[in-house]
Design a protein with these regions (language model features):
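Short beta-strand-to-coil "C-cap" segments at the C-terminal boundary of structured domains/repeats
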Residues: 141-144
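Catalytic core of non-heme Fe(II) oxygenases with the double-stranded beta-helix
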Residues: 52-128, 132, 136-138
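Non-heme Fe(II)/2-oxoglutarate
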Residues: 1-55
């Protein structure tokens, strides 16, 4: 698990505009069941300079409120390496012990997430998202 790029929201505004246009803000998602699938023409990982491949990746755009408990996706038709792009981060509920930023967990390691961070992680290993507020994300899945 690592941050591949940061500040993507400033450097790749056209990507963010396209993804945010397709975010259904009235739906709270658990990523797998309620995500909006992007069906447009943009190959986001190519636009972000991560992969220079012709075929598109499956893109799921989600609004998440609260934490996602530790889980393993391990979806057979997708490669284990997936990319998560943070579209926006809402304020936490600001409890006295609230975190300042959402935290992605995998393999005993935590990474704090900011708007515009592009993170690569292994979907077939246990991972979790800890946050007491809202976070909008796009997840890019590559077919095997």
């Amino acid at each position: 698990m690592q941050i591949v790029k940061s500040n993507c929201h400033n450097r790749y505004k056209h990507v963010f505009t396209e993804l945010r246009k397709h975010l259904n803000t009235s739906v709270i998602s658990d990523v797998n069941d309620s995500s909006q699938n992007y069906c447009g023409d943009m190959n986001f990982l190519k636009e972000l300079g991560v992969y220079n491949m012709k075929h598109k990746h499956h893109t799921m755009i989600s609004r998440i409120v609260g934490s996602i408990p530790p889980h393993v996706d391990d979806i057979y038709e997708y490669c284990s390496k997936v990319f998560l792009l943070v579209l926006s981060v809402g304020k936490g509920r600001e409890y006295r012990d609230s975190m300042d930023l959402p935290m992605l967990y995998q393999g005993g390691k935590f990474i704090s997430l900011r708007e515009g961070d592009l993170v690569a992680f292994n979907q077939s290993k246990e991972h979790a998202l800890f946050w007491d507020g809202r976070v909008d994300i796009a997840v890019f899945w590559k077919l095997r």
